[in-house]
Amino acid sequence: MRLFVGLGNPGSKYQDNRHNIGFMVIDEIARRHGFSPWRRRFQGETADGSLDGERITLLKPLTYMNESGRAVQEAVSFYKIGHGEVAVFHDEIELPPAKLRVKVGGGIAGHNGLRSISAHIGNDYLRVRLGVGHPGVKELVHGHVLGDFAKSERPWVAALAEAVADNAGLIAKGREATFANKVHLALQARGFLDDDNKKSGADKAAK
């Protein structure tokens, strides 16, 4: 059994924010794989299903980003799972738009959702880092992540969510490197990532 956690803030005010890309990806996994209807549990919403034969619970904390760890800890305690069975999907400003990185443990890079989760369950969980780009200067970061995706960004956001959902079973099987590679190739095939693996289609459109 694995717990997939998508990070974001609850409510319509925040639903299109860059900070909510974790919610968007988790919603897409639920849609594409026929998970159960969402229900209120663990200070959040959960949906149950399976990926490649592995039982999965999806969790969207409704505590607001800064308290996400409370919901995660409740779920981990209820299911009696180790940190290695937890995967957290979150926005990452240090990655270009449409880029993805997967890693276990490490720092929190100023992300308040990760800070809360690490404070509650420790650092040894999988992070699926979803690139949303950096505004260029530190002072603009807050407004950037709490700002909505522009209309021009929505195609790559949808493509990234679809690629993650299509390949999420690889995470359930512990094949994180293959997962990351397949997502990259899917985004590249649709023109949102350059062949040099450095720039996104969103970057090119902005020039």
Curated annotation (Swiss-Prot):
Binding of tRNA, residues: Y14, Y64, N66, N112
Active site: H19 (proton acceptor)
InterPro entries associated with the record: Pept_tRNA_hydro (IPR001328), Pept_tRNA_hydro_CS (IPR018171), Pept_tRNA_hydro_sf (IPR036416)
Feature type site, description Stabilizes the basic form of H active site to accept a proton: D91
Pfam families: Pept_tRNA_hydro
Record site feature (Discriminates between blocked and unblocked aminoacyl-tRNA), residues: N9
Gene3D superfamilies: Peptidyl-tRNA hydrolase (3.40.50.1470)
Entry's EC annotation: 3.1.1.29
A cellular-component GO term for this protein: cytoplasm
UniProt keyword list: Cytoplasm, Hydrolase, RNA-binding, tRNA-binding
Catalytic activity: an N-acyl-L-alpha-aminoacyl-tRNA + H2O = an N-acyl-L-amino acid + a tRNA + H(+)
SUPFAM superfamilies named in the record: Peptidyl-tRNA hydrolase-like
Main location: cytoplasm
Example GO molecular function: tRNA binding
Subcellular localization, as worded in the UniProt entry: Cytoplasm
Example of a GO biological process term: rescue of stalled ribosome
NCBIfam families, alphabetized: pth (TIGR00447)
Subunit structure: Monomer.
Function in brief: Hydrolyzes ribosome-free peptidyl-tRNAs (with 1 or more amino acids incorporated), which drop off the ribosome during protein synthesis, or as a result of ribosome stalling.
Name recorded for this polypeptide: Peptidyl-tRNA hydrolase
Origin species: Rhodopseudomonas palustris (strain BisB5)
